[in-house]
């Protein structure tokens, strides 16, 4: 059973797994909610691990870029900020960037209008979700492969 609310709480304090390398980002549509998924490369030393260090909350005003402090513009009337411990670049010698999309503009979702990746700053990934209506959401951390899922209600009634 999962709790729907307006703040995920701060998951950074109790980290067990990760950080993981971002592999993909995508959106999905369900009957009562829109879904945003961050998928990470599995960690062979922790095969059942999942991203457990995150903080998701409604932005108070215009979201700001972690590194520069510049405003981040998204489509929608409200912004939901997603911070998760993770890497945007491999930790190999060549430091290859993640192949995940930088921006998503779903067309079938009811409330979620856009997702923009601000990048990685000091091992923290920052995404901003532009939504039409400020509603309840839930956050799920799922293993195999490691994923962080943000489900945003389609309307305030559910």
Cite the ranges covered by each PLM segment:
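Short linear recognition/processing motifs and adjacent strand/loop elements at protein termini
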Residues: 1-158
């Amino acid at each position: 059973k999962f709790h729907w609310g307006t703040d995920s709480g701060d998951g950074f304090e109790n980290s067990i797994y990760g950080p993981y390398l971002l592999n993909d980002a995508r959106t999905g549509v369900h009957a009562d909610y829109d879904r945003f998924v961050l998928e990470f490369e599995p960690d062979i030393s922790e095969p059942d691990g999942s991203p457990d260090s995150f903080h998701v909350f409604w932005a108070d005003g215009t979201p700001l870029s972690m590194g520069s402090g510049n405003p981040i513009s998204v489509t929608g009337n409200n912004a939901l900020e997603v911070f998760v411990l993770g890497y945007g670049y491999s930790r190999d010698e060549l430091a290859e960037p993640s192949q995940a999309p930088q921006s998503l503009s779903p067309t079938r979702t009811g409330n979620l209008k856009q997702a923009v990746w601000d990048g990685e700053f000091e091992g923290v990934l920052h995404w901003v979700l532009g939504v039409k209506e400020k509603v309840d959401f839930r956050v799920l951390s799922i293993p195999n492969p490691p994923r962080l899922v943000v489900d945003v209600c389609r309307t305030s009634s559910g």
